[in-house]
Amino acid sequence: MLFSLLELVQWLGFAQLEIFLHIWALLVFTVLLALKADGFAPDMSWWNIFIPFFTADGLSTYFTTIVTVRLFQDGEKRQAVLRLFWILTILSLKFVFEMLLCQKLVEQSRELWFGLIMSPVFILLQLLMIRACRVN
């Protein structure tokens, strides 16, 4: 079951550019992960492998700020605030998950159990289910 680009834009709340940006980050992350797993880049740290995700989150936040300012200037304040809160909630949960996962991979500490690491993803999935029900 594949979604069209229009459905992804409606459900996620991201613009097409932001979706492309996150797909690009996933592609670069996958290449870096494969290089580390195959031993071609053994000295590369996990923080360096996660840089594409961090960069995509930062650029998406910057894009959201620009769109919010433009919506405020056009007089669509309610839509601007709702979009800002939604996107920042998604990006912050995604960022917390990435940081916790990267910290677990680097340190291998027992204090970071996988239930704690996955909790932002579970919250994000619940929010996406609620948004999917509201969109349709």
Swiss-Prot record:
Disulfide bonds: none
Organism of provenance: Xenopus tropicalis
Recorded topology in the membrane: Multi-pass membrane protein
Any single GO CC term annotated in Swiss-Prot or TrEMBL for this entry: endoplasmic reticulum-Golgi intermediate compartment
Pfam family, one: Tmemb_185A
Keyword Disulfide bond: no
InterPro entries registered for this protein in UniProt: TM_Fragile-X-F-assoc
Transmembrane spans: 14-34, 50-72, 81-101, 112-132
Protein name, UniProt field: Transmembrane protein 203
Acetylation in keyword set: no
Main location: endoplasmic reticulum
Biological function: Involved in the regulation of cellular calcium homeotasis. May act as a regulator of STING-mediated inflammatory signaling in macrophages.
Record's subcellular location: Endoplasmic reticulum membrane; Endoplasmic reticulum-Golgi intermediate compartment
Keyword vocabulary terms for this entry: Endoplasmic reticulum, Membrane, Transmembrane, Transmembrane helix
